[in-house]
Amino acid sequence: VAIFNESGLTLDLPDGLHFRFADLLAYKLLSGQNLKETDFAWIDGGKLFLLEVRSYAQVSTTLTGADLIPLKGQAVPHRFEALIDKLTDSLLMLLAAWADTDCGKSIKAGLPAAAKSRMPLKLVIAIEMPSTLSVHLSGLRDSLNARMRGRIALADVRNVALIDYARLLANPTFSAFVKAQV
């Protein structure tokens, strides 16, 4: 069992069935080249889950919907762009591993045995934000999926799930692995 604490959550991930890109030697060699990664990955029920967790609780007094959701004719918010980069780069790393490219072989070497072969993916972003901003979750989810639609289609992923911490902790798919920090 591997236990991680991040962004107000404790993750208890199954031995031999999880990884963090950040811990892979191949990723460490590439990370200085503007490559990003999702926080956690684990296998459950024949699917590979990629999870990014973000807590905006500390910046709740200054955060607005415009800090999260792109508006037509304006610069894309950096928080939104960071999520796009993390998902896209994580998909690229997995697809490279499964395609056995030179870099992909190095990435594959660090993956659990079950993740070394192509498998169905679930992309999940869990966000903690104050209730005053929760009204923006659906807009953020829709904007994120619109921007990612072509990219995720290349990996046979239908959509990105964007949920708040309460839904993450209440969902049986995740509650076996994820708890709120005490």
What are these regions (language model features)?
Residues V1, T132-V182:
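Polybasic (Lys/Arg-rich)
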Residues V1-T38, P172-V182:
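Basic, amphipathic N-terminal segments that precede the first structured/catalytic domain
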Residues Q33, W42-G45, K116-R118:
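Flexible, charged surface loops at secondary-structure boundaries
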Residues F40-W42, F49-S55:
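Conserved catalytic cores of phosphodiester-cleaving nucleases, focusing on short active-site segments
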Residues K47-F49, K122:
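Structural motif
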Residues F49, V59, T132:
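Flexible, glycine-rich phosphate/dinucleotide-binding loops
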Residues Y56-A126, A146-R158:
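Catalytic cores of nucleic-acid endonucleases
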Residues I127-S131:
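Short beta-alpha junction loops
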